[in-house]
Every structure is written in C-alpha cells, then in structure tokens.
C-alpha cells in the first residue's frame, strides 16, 4: 500500500475525529481553530476555541467586539498579534459584505492568514484540493522520503509544498490533511516515535538509514535576546496602577504595572534606589520585600523579571498609569508573566 492510502487507513482507525473543529465545515470556526492552534497545543487550544466561539459565534459578533474584549479572551495563549489579526480580519470580512471568502486567494487576503491557514480553511471548509504543510507535515515527509533540504529556507518550503500537493487525495483533501497532521502529532512525534508500530516504517527512509532524530533539518538559528524588567505593582489596598503596553513591542496592547527596564542585570540595591526616585512624592509607601524574581521565556526572548508589590496610601499620578479597582482587574488583558507575579505577590486578594 502506498503512502497516501496507508495514511488514510491509519487515520480512519487512530485519528482525532472528535475534535470540535473537525465536526463542522463552517469556515469561520475552522479559521478560529487554525489561528488558535498556531504555537498552541491541541489540549490547551480546544479550551480557548470553545470559549472563543461561544463568546463570538459569528464573524459579525467578533467584528463588533472591542479589541480589549478580544485580547482578554485570548489572555494566556500568547502571540497576541494573532488575536489582533483575527479581529481586524473579521472587520475586513464585514466591510466586504459579511460573507466568509470561498476561494484561496480571497481567504489568503485576510489579515494574518498565511499559505498554511488559507490551505487549511479551503480544504476543511470547502473540500478544495489544497495541501497543508505545518511542523507535523514537514517532519513526516522529511523522515519518510529522507529529505535533507532545510525546511526553513525558500528551496525547502517550495520542495515540501510541491511534495505535499503531489500526495494529496483529490477526493478527500480534508481527511488527508487531518491524517498527516495527526500522524505527525501522535505517531511520528519529534521525540521517541514508536517506529516499530508505524505502518510506514518499512519504506521510511529515515528509519532505514538511522536518521529519525536528524530529520527534518533547519538551517537557521535565531538569536535569543535577553531583557531585564523591573515591575512595580503599586496599589492602595483596593486599586492598582496599570498602563497599556505600546505598539511595536512584545505584549502590544496588553496591560501592565509600572515598568522600569534595564539594559543589563542590575542589583536589588540599585533597583530599590530607582523605586524611591520614581515614588519620591509618595508618603508612607511600603515596599514588600524580598522581591519576586523569575525568568519568563518567549520564542526569541528571555525575560528576567523582578517584581515588587508597593503599598501607597495615596496612589501617585504617574504618566498614563490608571487606577484599576481590584474587583475589575479581570477585565484587563495582561501577559501571563504579569498574572503569575500578581498571584505570587497576592495582589488583589
């Protein structure tokens, strides 16, 4: 049995047929699921998907929402540009008459929709013959066919896209795409794949040549930057000061307490001196010590956070900071790192 029929037979028996976005052909819901599942595990993504489509069941409902409301529902997923792009694309659809696009070019033209997402929507919603190529697909194809072309270069992307298209079932594109993605997620996993139970192992080039852990190949190595952030959780026992993060940086549009950023590791003594400079007009302030310090890892950045809870009997006026009652903090979308710090510092309890 050749590659595609074997894959479809495996999927019929082992595939994740009960995932909610596989039980619908609604392009809106499939779009939402595909955006959420970028950089997100299925188990976590399913919870967010169900909450998202319950709150915004249609394109119109999403388009009418405020950005703050969308970001708040997205809180904890990271990569917040995905949520902003979803919101912008929903408005784009409504401006075009309110009907979700039905062909690849128009789907691809939506804000934040790349080739993979457009192919997935067209295949899963409309049964059009487009092959998806994600991390799972790269891994399965690279191993099975023994491809050593780096997957992150122009040549590799073209080679894998052409190969995926040649293998696609024209009569069942949705099933084929689901099959190869599930096969990569469940069988041909990045680590510890169970090759002895694999229906493709006899003709798998990586298995035959002992290259399972060498494929696929990536050529580029993105440098990881480090940032040193001092966060001041200034409160009066009932309210805390927050500001919205600026555009063009991590966590754009989310809320945070007062931030002081350093270019290099800095001693607590220097940070405490800076706190007193910033809050020199605040009488009776009490700084909770020791500071909470932890590391937060993003895709291409490592953040070193130092966090102080500071009680001020009278909240100071500091730039664009606004006082937010503890009871309303849940209405403000904040980065996961800030929520973690608030919990450990027991802010708002």
Stretches found by the model and what they are:
Residues 1-17, 23, 185-349:
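Intrinsically disordered, low-complexity, charged terminal extensions of DNA damage-control enzymes
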Residues 3-196, 200-213, 276, 280-284:
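Catalytic cores of DNA base-excision repair glycosylases
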